[in-house]
Amino acid sequence: MRSPNSDLDHRHPALAPLLEAGFAPGRLEQVLAFYDEPHRAYHDRVHLREMFDASITLGVPLNATQGLALLFHDAIYVPGAARGTNEMMSAQLLRVYTAGLERSMVDSACSLVIDTAEHIARSQEAELVLDLDLMRLAAAPLDFDRYSRQVFAEQRSLIAIADDTEALAFFSSRRVPFFQQLLDRPWVYCTPAGRKHFEAPARANLRRAIGVKPYAYGNG
């Protein structure tokens, strides 16, 4: 059952440019159903809704291409898939669901989806999409820990360690290189809004995650 806070439909103001570009509300509901799959604990409709909400509250409106990319960026999520595979399949799904829409917009949206695999912006349009995708890194510490446990829950069946505490420690250690890679960048976030609102708390969370081994998750 979805949380009331996960409600996302064609009435959301951030989706208006996408719908005005010809993406049908019925197709929108079909895509959103992918985010309700039972194996998802983090990459779900709540995550998606938060990103669209943030584009409104931060005053950084999405254009149709960016909205399309956000909508599809985690549409396919198979835990344990090789890096980039989920994003590539999500981009392929995007093409299936956008037959008849402007070709250049679809091509650009697919490129943005693929950029989310490495979180490297290869165009200016990608910058806002990537910032919104990484916004949870800047959550309050207890929320950051909760999100980390949600990702762990999605990966748990792939970790051949019976003890949950040991499995969590192993999972945490596997995330360190990615977190360090983000910290080594001059900026974690690309846009002025992302740097203003997310940069400092995200770096604090990432340093904490890397500095404590095994990672001491909060109870919140």
Question: Language-model features: where?
Answer:
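His-Asp-centered metal-binding catalytic motifs of divalent-metal-dependent phosphohydrolases/nucleases
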Residues: 51, 63-80, 90, 110-117
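Hydrophobic/basic alpha-helical segments enriched in Actinobacteria
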Residues: 17-24, 56-58, 96-97
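Hydrophobic, proline/glycine-rich low-complexity stretches
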Residues: 2-29
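Divalent metal-dependent phosphate-bond-processing catalytic cores, especially two-metal-ion Mg2+/Mn2+ enzymes
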Residues: 2-3, 11-14, 36-43, 53-62, ...
